[in-house]
């Protein structure tokens, strides 16, 4: 894996009452185009139940972290280790979704002594296939276009309506059921739009990711990440949605080569974003694993 200059990551911290400072803290790592906010109150619940300090970070080119032209999934490993060094974290528990899961996987394999346990949400150990990268590229592009069409000063309902209508009108029919669409688009009328945004000085909404850098990286799937290598023998939990594109039967042999002590939990009624679709079931699975 090539070496990259790390960037400063934004984060939020949860310190539970009665925090046990002798226990390694927990770090939550989001997926592509998400942010630290999209873990909702799960970091608080897990921190309070385990009496461990918890962090939720924004990856580079996401949320409030530094934006840079350099971006691929390998960069995130260097950024995570830099963050741990800056915060004085010798060892941590990693709970990570999708792209963040790949960060956790590669970190655990690279420096297993710095990872006590890991929870991987709805991603395997293999690089994403080109077909999936194409889907993600389409969705990032359409989402960004939709955000740009939102009128300045619009309320939340107008924002949601404008973006979803633009995507719906322009999304190829064969992509309507893909995991990225499922991840971001509301499933019910009162659902929140799972897209990180901010309001600029002109009142216009902006995608809270570095769109040019991410789209440029997605143009070259073969260089998006190097293949994971090594063995992590400590406890590992792979959580997946039973409605997602993750197929345990086909992925388990690849996972077990690198993570021989991996356990698997499938969550009913969950798509790619298990922690958003079924937060109670996700949190219960995480706590059971951490408290074993």
Residue map of PLM features:
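Active-site loop/oxyanion-hole signature of alpha/beta-hydrolase fold enzymes
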Residues: 7, 15-19, 40, 50-95, ...
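Short beta-strand element of the alpha/beta-hydrolase
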Residues: 23-31
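Active-site glycine-rich loops that stabilize anionic/oxyanionic intermediates
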Residues: 31-34, 98
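Hydrolases whose catalytic domains are alpha/beta-hydrolase-1, hotdog thioesterase
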Residues: 103-107
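Flexible "cap/lid" loop of the alpha/beta hydrolase fold
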Residues: 109, 116-159
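Conserved alpha/beta-hydrolase catalytic His-Asp/Glu region
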Residues: 130, 150-223
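Conserved serine/cysteine hydrolase catalytic core
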Residues: 188-257, 263-266
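Catalytic histidine-centered segment of alpha/beta-hydrolase-like enzymes
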Residues: 270-279, 283
């Amino acid at each position: 894996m090539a070496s990259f200059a790390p960037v400063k990551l934004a984060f939020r911290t949860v310190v539970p009452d009665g925090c046990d400072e002798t226990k390694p803290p927990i770090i939550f790592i989001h997926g592509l185009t998400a942010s630290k906010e999209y873990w909702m109150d799960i970091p608080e619940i897990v921190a309070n139940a385990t009496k461990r300090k918890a962090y939720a970070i924004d990856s580079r080119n996401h949320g409030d972290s530094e934006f840079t032209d350099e971006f691929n999934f390998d960069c995130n490993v260097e950024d995570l280790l830099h963050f741990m060094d800056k915060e004085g974290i010798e060892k941590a528990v990693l709970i990570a979704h999708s792209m963040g899961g790949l960060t956790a996987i590669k970190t655990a394999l690279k420096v297993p002594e710095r990872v006590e346990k890991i929870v991987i949400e709805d991603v395997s150990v293999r690089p994403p296939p080109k077909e999936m990268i194409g889907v993600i590229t389409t969705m990032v592009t359409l989402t960004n276009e939709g955000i740009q069409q939102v009128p300045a000063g619009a309320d939340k309902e107008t924002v949601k309506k404008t973006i979803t209508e633009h995507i719906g009108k322009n999304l190829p029919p064969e992509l309507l059921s893909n995991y990225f669409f499922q991840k971001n688009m509301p499933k019910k009328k009162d659902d929140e739009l799972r897209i990180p945004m901010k309001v600029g000085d002109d009142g216009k909404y902006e995608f809270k990711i570095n769109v040019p850098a991410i789209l440029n990286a997605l143009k070259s799937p073969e260089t998006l990440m190097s293949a994971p290598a090594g063995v992590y023998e400590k406890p590992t939990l792979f959580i997946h949605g039973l409605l997602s594109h993750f197929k345990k039967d086909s992925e388990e042999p690849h996972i077990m080569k690198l993570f021989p002590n991996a356990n698997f939990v499938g969550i009913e009624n969950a798509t790619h974003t298990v922690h958003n679709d079924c937060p109670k079931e996700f949190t219960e699975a995480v706590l059971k694993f951490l408290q074993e």
